Structures are given as structure tokens and as C-alpha cells.
């Protein structure tokens, strides 16, 4: 299959490489072309415009930063809908607004449009072990399932357009609570004079265990803030979930508190660090 890939950031680059390894013909575009460096050595064609990337593709995948970037990539005169061939499969894997996912599906009637945000960070992207949450027409999901399987292990169809994004919001809400709790537990341990790593070994295999405890708590203890997922993007995700619920006149108090913590450390210059840098709030 000829695949166009737009967005080669922390996760997108590895995902495009995994599609190439699976035998697909992959074309990529990124607004900052320097991020595509080295991809041509792996047999991936680097394009200078969206039009060049998508105009003859069978399937088009996007994973960009913010909903405004999604709108530009899809709806501008130089974007996907204006330049993709009719009948192509178009999948947005950005964590974005459920309302925008529905809008793209409604506008893109000449195409097979899916929303398919992912979870698993840079490690999951590299290892092709991502969780992929898909919304849209079920037959379109089934057609692209072998392609999704080149990037992930836990691939779930959720329902109509926007359902993938709503599921991803659930994912980010759950992460917000667990990563904040892990940081607070590590802070407590060190504040009362315990060795953080010893405490982590004691509690991580019981009821307190979680992916965040296994993967991010050790990084917190080592002040290793290399981003598997940027704080600035997590703030964006939490705001999407908050705004969706506020539109229903409902509140998410735990999410709102964690969002406040992340906005605090972002304001102190840490927006480009990994989400584990939440521990810095306590320092």
C-alpha cells in the first residue's frame, strides 16, 4: 500500500518507520523538514509539500501537535482534503478534539475518514506496541486493521466518528491521576527520609502498581525528564477533556487539579520536558 505520513515528531517518526518495515511504500511530510533527516536512508520518500505527499496515496495518516494544526493540515487550500485522491483512507492519529474528528468526517465525504489516537509514548511507537483507539465506519477500520497492526498491539474499534478521540480523553484522564499520584508518593518517600527506589520496589508490585509507577516513577527519582510525551501536549489533551465535559455542564475535579499542576511547571519553563517532570512541582 502507498501510505502518506504527515508528522514525524517523537512518535510519528517511529510509526512511519514501522510501516516501512511492514512492506508499505511510505511518503512523509513534516512542516520542519529537518526532522525527516535520515528517513530516506531507510527507504522513505521525504516530500516538500502536503500535496506531493498525499496526491496518489492509498492511505494518509497524520499525527501533529494541536487541533489547530489538524485543521490546517486537513482543511487549508494546500491540505489533505484539497489534494488527496477520492476514495483514499484518511486517519488522524493526533490526540485532538472529538468535535473536530466529527467535523472532518462530515466534511470528508469523498474519503474514508477515521480518528485513531494512540497511547504508549515513544517506547510504544518504537516497539510497535501502541494502543490505538479508532472511531469511524467499522468497515473502514477493518480494511486498515493490518496497517494498524504494524504500529500497535491493542487496537480497538470504539464506534462512530469522534469515538476514538473520546476514548483517548478517558485514557488521559486516567493517566493524569496515576502520574500525579506516583509523583506525590515519591515526594512523600524522600521527604520522610526513605530511599525512593526502595519504596518503589516495595509498592509497585501491589495494589499501587501501574504503568506510570513502573515507567515514569524511576525517571522522577533520577530527574530524567527526557520526553516520551511532552508536558505541553499533555496540557493540550487535558484541556480537550475538560472542555468536552464543560460543554455538558460537568466538572472533572481531579483532572482540573492535575492540569493546574502541569500549567504551573510549564510556566516555569518545563513545557518541553516529559510528563514525569511533574515531580518538579514539589521541589
Where are these regions (language model features)?
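Rossmann-fold dinucleotide-binding core
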Residues: 96-173
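Interdomain hinge/lid region at the active-site interface
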Residues: 209-271, 275
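Rossmann-like NAD(P)(H) cofactor-binding subdomain of soluble oxidoreductases
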Residues: 50-55, 59, 67-130
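Conserved beta-strand segments of alpha/beta enzyme cores
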Residues: 25, 43-45, 89, 112, ...
